[in-house]
Amino acid sequence: MIVTFHSYKGGTGKTLLSMNLATLFATMGKRVCLIDLDLRAPSLHLIFKNGKEYWVNDYLNKVCNIESVLTDCSTEGMGKGKLLVGLANPSTEAILEMESKNRTWEMEVLGRLLSFKTYLLNNMPFDYVFFDASPGLIYSSINAIVCADVVLVVTSTDKSDVEGTRRMIRECYELFDRKIGIIINKVPTESLSLKIYNNSIQLGTHQLPIIGVIPCSCDVATAGRCLFDCEKLNHPFTEKIREIATNLELIWGTTDNTIMTIHNLVSSESSLRPNLLHHPVS
């Protein structure tokens, strides 16, 4: 399954969520691949060290093959699980190069990403491939959406973010007909008990599952880019990541064994039933 993490704007916690969810599934015995497609503001390299000569940029530029950009970041704690990571080049030169790419190049990249998807799922093969896409509606993020089986849209409670996310889903996502899940991050503690987060948000006739509602936490902010499932097993944020993993499997997954394994990890107080977000047709 290809899962793309996307957001209307930066600063929503999209990257932190993608790398922690990827690590969690690997810890549970899954074969997982995490790819940094935020080519204009890469950040996964701050957590994972590139053990290869090449970057994702090089594959997209037809410099190397797929396996040349994948670094094995598996740990002993993952057992039979596997975590391979493809990192975007963080150098200023590489970022400026990505900024200068034209539409023709981006269209060619879509073909490269589709080949990437086919190869990873059929030849490696992976249970999950996570794309950490650029925020907003630029060609590179649209490519990541088109290649996905499921798109997880991360939003905060900021009004401009919510309205932008709503508009983005209505005007763009429906064109691609992708499965979509919503993660609401950085929710003020005093708002967690409100009906809007516990039940549903009426925005129209279409229903989208809210697979995670994550409270704002100073601990998460000060921890930086931390792999919570490895370093902070009992942290509330870790429990929320497990809840998101459960909901992802419940809604779109195919294996009951994974769900049961997650259930054993999740606190009995956590709600495993996904909520619903509605958005307008027009």
Task: Identify the residue ranges that each predicted region occupies.
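Charged, alpha-helix-enriched surfaces in structured cytosolic catalytic cores
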Residues: 39, 51-54, 65, 108, ...
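Conserved catalytic-core segment of NTP-binding enzymes
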Residues: 27, 114-213, 222
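Flexible glycine-/small-residue-rich
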Residues: 7, 36, 87-90, 133, ...
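Conserved beta-strand scaffold positions in the cores of enzyme catalytic domains, especially
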Residues: 2, 83-85, 210-213
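C-terminal lobe/tail of nucleotide-utilizing enzymes
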Residues: 174-282
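Walker A/P-loop NTP-binding active-site region of P-loop NTPases
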Residues: 2-68, 127-128
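P-loop/Walker-type NTP enzyme "switch/lid" segment
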Residues: 39-121, 222-225, 230
